Curated annotation (Swiss-Prot):
A cellular-component GO term for this protein: plasma membrane
Top enzyme category: hydrolase
EC number: 3.4.24.-
Binding site for Zn(2+): 147, 151, 224
GO MF entries: metalloendopeptidase activity; zinc ion binding
Active-site residues, record numbering mapped to chain: 148
Protein name stated in the entry: Protease HtpX homolog
GO biological process, any: proteolysis
Primary localization: membrane
Cofactor remark from the record: Binds 1 zinc ion per subunit.
Domain of life: Bacteria
Pfam families: Peptidase_M48 (PF01435)
């Protein structure tokens, strides 16, 4: 909760600074001169409620939605040696990382993957695919589990959710500002909002949304490097390198839903470019581990 509180305070401070900056630049005076009647403070609050609200609700529901989207089955009582090893390995790593014991689950999928999700460090979920258990050795699987436990220990779910909330707020706020400016200054709408406002706001939101995605994906890639380093500490660098090598050899397109793909061990290859990848290329991750 401390992490959430600090991030919210920081992000609200950023929004206040944005409002002050726009006022110092005279944007509010320009809009007033054009008769827009735009209330900066009300727009900021509305943008923050929508931007942060959606992100935090998604975070709060992350465990429930992840289980339902993947069909993951939580291991309540291990029914075989593999499940017993899985639970005990996560328990040992969670204790070493200083986090509460997460729920451990298995979901049916042929690809080698795993993910972690949850609202906080002491109420999380670690899930692995059936394909991972079938195709990886115990050492490799141990490294993958350590990677996911490191995501939990680093608070990555909360961090990315709040970053997403910030960029959502900026996108909503700035797209409406742009819509007002174009509608009043260019199309000379005198009262209310003309068609230009809605069209311009929509286009601006799409363009800014793309830029926002690039920012969020950059943060996601940095968190992957940190989780790899955390795995190296918990399970050993050689095991983590071996796990990444196995991913290179056995690569299959990820079957994880987009909402939780950022926390899978195996990222999806992007045809558009690296800017939109949630995970760094596997070779770069291996090089980072070997040079550490």
């Amino acid at each position: 909760m401390k992490r959430i509180f600090l991030f919210i305070v920081t992000n609200l401070a950023i929004l206040v600074m944005l409002s002050i900056t726009l006022r110092l630049l005279g944007v509010d005076r320009i809009l007033d001169a054009e008769g827009s009647g735009l209330n900066f403070n009300a727009l900021l609050v509305l943008s923050a409620v929508i931007g942060f609200g959606g992100s935090l609700i998604s975070l709060a529901m992350s465990k429930w939605s992840a289980k339902h989207m993947t069909g993951a089955t939580v291991i309540e009582i291990p029914s075989n040696s593999t499940e017993g090893w899985l639970v005990e390995t996560v328990r040992r790593q969670a204790k070493a990382a200083g986090v509460g014991m997460p729920e451990v689950a298995i979901y049916d999928s042929p690809d080698i993957n795993a993910f972690a999700t949850g609202m906080n460090r002491n109420n999380a979920l670690v899930a692995v695919s059936s394909g991972l258990l079938q195709k990886m050795s115990r050492d490799e699987a141990e490294a993958v589990l350590a990677h996911e436990v490191s995501h939990i220990a680093n608070g990555d779910m909360v961090t990315l959710a709040l970053i997403q909330g910030v960029v959502n707020t900026f996108v909503i706020f700035l797209s409406r500002i742009i819509g007002h400016v174009i509608d009043r200054a260019v199309f000379r709408t005198e009262e209310g909002h003309g068609p230009a406002y809605f069209v311009t706001s929509l286009v601006a939101q799409l363009v800014l949304g793309i830029l926002a995605t690039i920012i969020v994906m950059w943060f996601s890639r940095q968190r992957e490097f940190r989780a790899d380093a955390g795995s190296a500490q918990l399970s050993g660098r050689n095991k983590m390198v071996a796990a990444l090598r196995r991913l290179q050899q056995e690569y299959e397109p990820s079957h994880l839903p987009d909402k939780i793909a950022a926390f899978g061990i195996s990222g999806q290859k992007s045809q558009i470019g690296r800017l939109f990848m949630s995970h760094p290329p596997l070779e770069e991750r291996i090089q980072a581990l070997q040079s550490a």
